[in-house]
Amino acid sequence: MNLKDFEDRLLGVSFPKKDVYGSLSIPVYHSLAFEFDSAEEMEDAFCGRTNEHTYSRVTNPTVHYFEERVKAVTNAFGVTALNSGMAAISNAFFTLAWSGSNIVASRHLFGNTYSFFVNTLTSFGVEIRFCDLTNIDEVSSMIDDNTCALFVEVITNPQMEVANLKDLSRVAHQKNVPLVADTTIVPFSAFNAADLGVDIDLISSTKYISGGGTSLGGLIIDYGNFNWEHSFKLKQYTSLSKSAFHYKLRKEIHRNLGAYMTPEVAYMQSLGLETLHVRYEKESKTCLELAKLLQNLKGVVSVNYTGLADNPFYEIGLSQFGECPGAMLTFDLGSKDLCYRFLNRLELIKRATNLFDNVSLIIHPASTIYGTYTPEQREMLGVKETTLRLSVGLESVDALYNDIKQALL
């Protein structure tokens, strides 16, 4: 999708009901409940015979508009907006998994996703099968009749590995298993996940979509392409909806877990959508230019960015995400002490977590996100104490490079 297509689709989505004052900005409905003209209309709404809003934990006009805008630019069947990226992951897998089922995934996962899988889902009787997602034969051998999903982070954080989505999709679909992907690192304005075989897309909208680090949010995007008749848990809903997954999620799981996005966040992130493409274009190009400069900077041991020609994942990253695959890179210094010394000398780049804010952010993953993990767990997850993760913002390449350079002296 090019910029013109993205913006035209996004800005072409009208609010479902005309505002009484003709506001060009999105109305923010902070109302918890909604009045009906009759008992009959209320019954129809609560029983799902109409699409009227009843209670903002279930649906809300402002949040629904945000969901519709995401649908318009992704060609999705259904979109559910939640209050964080982890809410998206947990809601999705509580919809998919059952006691006795298993999930096939990479060992190299974002810290909270790993914790949710290993500590939370396993307590409900769900098995997590870790494997190398870049080894298709190994992936295939892990999938069986009780596999509820093959899960992949399109670029792992902070390990920066890239799996072949088309190959994973082919193996998963041959065995009647959905491919579920966390695509947070590369936004949907830059690539089409459904074209690469992704069935369910999970996104932390806190990141690129929020833009300015103003709000927490998460998205579950169902492309409506998977045949759920082979799902042990969801096949009973196939006669009720084109997507049994979306039906189960909206009618039960998200209502019961109570993690729906708030109207204020939907308003802010809907505005963020309007500048997503132009912000990402600048940030990702800056990230590539900076990565090239860091390769030749004294004191930097190694640089990991998929867009570098000597990166082992360069070709697959280029084919899936283009020349600038995301606005995050990692680089290694000689020791943890050198990392801390460097962090403490930075003047422009902010020492903070989060990704894809308008300002550049840096963090030492091993001591923060993975700080409570054992050394053995960090080694298994591929997290090194010499690694720094940099999220590139809207600053100039020169300003970022000069800040890094002076901090290394």
Residue positions per predicted region:
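N-terminal glycine-rich, Lys/His-bearing helix-loop that initiates the first secondary-structure elements
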Residues: 1-52
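Conserved PLP-enzyme active-site core in the AAT-like
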Residues: 7-16, 78-298
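Short loop segments at secondary-structure junctions
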Residues: 33, 223-226, 333-337
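Short Gly/aromatic-enriched secondary-structure transition segments
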Residues: 43-49, 346, 404-407
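PLP-dependent enzyme catalytic core of the Aspartate aminotransferase-like
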Residues: 118-119, 127-128, 141, 145, ...
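Conserved small-domain helix->loop->beta segment predominantly found in fold-type I
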Residues: 259, 271, 280-282, 287-358, ...
